[in-house]
Amino acid sequence: MTCVCALLDAIRIYLYQLLQVLINVLFTPLPPSADAPKMGRVAVIGAGLTGLSSAAQLKSHGFDVTIFEERAREGGIWCDVNSTSNLQTSSIMYRFHPLVFYRSIYPCRDDILAQQRKVWNTYRLDENVRFNTRVTKVDRNKAGRWIINGNASETFDGLVVTVGTCGKPNMIPLPNQKSFRGEILHSSQLDEHDFEGKRVVVIGGGASGVEAAETALERGAKKATILARKDHWIIPRQLLVDCFITLFPYGSRFLAWLVPEQLIRRLHYRELDEKMS
C-alpha cells in the first residue's frame, strides 16, 4: 500500500510539473527589450507577491515601473516567516505569475522566495526600485498625475497599490507577562529555538498557530496546546480536499456548504489527533 501511495504521489507531482511547464510556455509574457518604447510611468506600492507580479506584467507591456517598498528587499510576508513555513494550500492555487515553477505541491518559504527572485530577475525589476521607502501620502496634481510622498518633481501616469493585508509581526500584551517564568515568542521567531521537553501553549488556531504547534512537537516539546476562540478545520494536505474546501467561501452558490462539519472532523481530523496525542 505504501508503494502504491508513493507511486501515485510521484505521478501527481509529475503531472503537476508538466502543467506548470505548459503554463510557462503558453502564458509567460516576454520581458521587454532595453530599447523598447515606454507606454507610461506607473508606481507600484509594495514588493510582495502581488506587487512583484503586477510590476512584471506592467513591464512586459512596455510601462516604465517604479516600485516603492518599505522593507530592505522584495518578498512581502514571506520575508517574516520561519524557514519551516510552507503553504497550507496547494501551490496550484498560489501561482502569482506564469513563470513560477514549483517542484512540490506544498513548497516551503525558501522555494517561494526563490520563485519570486526568478520573476524579479527575469523582468529586471531591480532597475527602478526604492527599498526602505514607506509611502505615507499619495496625491494627484491638476493634470491627473500621481504624486508619491509629496515629491511633485516626480509624477506617474498610473498607481498600483499592493500593500496586502499582512503586516509586520505583532506581539500582543498579556496580563502578568513580566512575571511569567517561561519564554514568550512570536510565531515568526521559531527558527533554531529549542523546545526539548517543554510544554508549549500557542495562542491562535490559524495557519501560523498550527504550524507553530507542529514545529514545537517536531523539536521535542513534551506537549503543545492550541488556544483558539473557535474550532477550525485542520485537515491533511491533500490536493483534492484543498480544491473542494476552496468552494466554501462562495456559500450557497456551490453545494459544498451542505457537507456537515462532523463528517469533515471524522474524515480529516484524525491525523491531527494522532499527532497531538
State the predicted function of each range.
Residues 34-36, 47-49, 54, 58-74, ...:
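Rossmann-like dinucleotide-binding core of oxidoreductases
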Residues 100, 136, 142, 189-192, ...:
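Residue-level detector of flexible, active-site-proximal loop/helix-junction positions
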Residues 1-41, 167-188:
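Extreme N-terminal leader/targeting segments of oxidoreductases
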Residues 93, 129-130, 182-185:
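Conserved beta-strand scaffold positions in the cores of enzyme catalytic domains, especially
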